[in-house]
Each structure stands twice: as structure tokens, then as C-alpha cells.
Regions:
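Membrane-proximal linker segments that couple transmembrane helices to downstream signaling/catalytic modules
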Residues: 1-77, 81, 99, 115-120
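Sequence-specific DNA-binding recognition helix
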Residues: 74-110
Length: 120
């Protein structure tokens, strides 16, 4: 546990999110750690200790938040393309993760304007 290293990782992750790097199709943990100028082990430890989840889960949640926004902002673009724009490389995984995290399908999310509980 190194507080200075964790602070550095936190700052690098903030920039990574601002730049929407989470939308890049799956890279290895080694590649991402390298981009963040840290080791794979330090990145794993940061997520386990600070975030209380693994990196892939966190990245998936960022992608789902992005897709929720895109589904409402851009109603002309197909749901499959929205999934790709948010960083999902395959349609089935996008739908599965969306339903798991949001509790409804991307189509239901879009049709309800982001309020799936208020179905008309």
C-alpha cells in the first residue's frame, strides 16, 4: 500500500475518464496500466482497496453510463451502434451488461426517456 502511488493512479484515472478512454475496445490490463504509468499489480491493488471492485467492472459501469446518455441524446442512431460508441465490442455483451446494471433493456431505456419505472 503506497498512498502516493494511489493518489497518482487516481489522478491518471480521472484524466482517463475525462478523455473517455473507457470507450476504447478491450485492452489488456497491462496496456491500460502502461497508459496510466503504473504496474498491473498497483492498478489491481488500487481497485481492490479503494474502489472495492475490479477494473473491468468499473469500466463496464462507465460504458453503461455513457450508453444511457447516448440512447437519450441520439434517438436516430441504432442501439447496436450506441453500444459500440460506448465501448462494447459485441452486441450480446452490451445488452446483457445493460440489463444487469440498469434493470431494463437499452430499447426500454430509450423509449421511456430514461425512466423505465414510469412505463406508459
Amino acid at each position: 500500500f503506497n498512498a502516493a502511488e494511489f493518489k497518482r493512479i487516481e489522478k491518471a484515472l480521472e484524466i482517463w475518464v475525462q478523455e473517455k478512454r473507457f470507450k476504447e475496445f478491450d485492452k489488456s490490463r497491462e496496456e491500460i496500466a502502461k497508459e496510466l504509468r503504473t504496474s498491473k499489480e498497483s492498478l489491481h491493488l488500487y481497485f481492490a482497496t479503494v474502489m472495492k471492485m475490479d477494473f473491468r467492472t468499473w469500466r463496464t459501469e462507465l460504458r453503461i453510463e455513457e450508453s444511457k446518455k447516448l440512447l437519450l441524446e441520439d434517438k436516430e442512431t441504432s442501439i447496436n451502434i450506441i453500444g459500440e460508441m460506448a465501448g462494447f465490442s459485441d452486441r450480446a455483451n452490451f445488452y446483457r451488461q445493460f440489463v444487469k446494471i440498469v434493470g431494463c433493456s437499452p430499447k426500454e431505456w430509450r423509449e421511456s426517456n430514461g425512466n423505465p419505472d414510469l412505463k406508459s
